[in-house]
Amino acid sequence: MKEITTNNNMPICLVSGGKDSQATAIWCLKNNVKPFFLFCDTEWEDVVTYDFINEFEKKLGSEIIRLKSIGFEKLALKKKRFPSTKGKFCTEELKVKPMIDHILEQKANITIYQGIRWEESTNRAGMEKSDEYFRYYFEPYKVTGRFDDILKTIELGFIPATKKNDGLLKRLEKKNQIKVDDANFYKLVKEANELPENRIEHFYTYRKQDIIEWLKTYSCDVERPIISWTVDQVFNYIIDNGFLPNKLYQYGFTRVGCFPCIMCTKDEVAKVIEYRPEKIEHIKKLEIEMNSTFFPPNYIPTKYCSKIIDVKDKKTGKVRKVGIPSMIDVVRYVQAKGYGSGLFTGSHCQNQLLPCE
């Protein structure tokens, strides 16, 4: 996407197909913001969501610009695996990076309007109503301790002298004069872990030098106008202003981003089986093609998995059984256990720069 404005100020409202971004878009119109509307297309949304985006665009009376990425499926094929809970690269590659690329092409001061609410998750409860978009390029989004793993190992009741911790133990002895057989070892490690030289700051880094140069001339701020709203307030606001939310909510889905998400609940899987069985079949084929499973190990109880492997626990040295569930296994389990009835809560992506919904 090339430059779309050279005006001094440029408001952007992110539209995902979900209720919160829809309410934010309506709020912008009612408050005379007149933003450019952007939809980051992962090419993994449901057809109902794509239809919703098209209809919402007509109702808004303003174009919704589609930002394209490599797409979820092509990204997974390229990496030869699906995203996972520990390697959740999907949001960054499919939404955050295309958005940053787009921002850096603009010659304007930008204000981004995000549909994020405090009650959605613990992570979002800590967000501010107004912020700087590139904040976590210049201050850490989290700080960890160099010896966190040793402390966790001790807290779990295991001896810290594991292969994973060997280098850390040597560092403790050399730099901090702490040995594993010292009295009050845990207390000493905890104190050492809080020393400035043992604190590790984590920053976002994608195109950092380009961002630094861009920020010499322009700014990029974030506004979250509905951050304090409840879910009822969101739906009521949409309907009271003459709009209808994404039809997937009527079908029982609570989140309507990637369809399905690798972090979706078993209730959500049941809904996909019911409404989009062809998507389930497609994922089965992708699993075979990539020799990778869509869901993580132990997503369902091990005894229900067709593939079970032995894994040596790094902390105890003991071997344990870990189930690797195929989509076929998950479907059988979900149907056998009666998932999908009643309300359920979706999972939440944690990226600070761009919400999944």
How should each PLM-predicted stretch be described?
Residues M1-E357:
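Nucleotide-activated chemistry modules centered on ATP-dependent adenylation/adenylyltransferase
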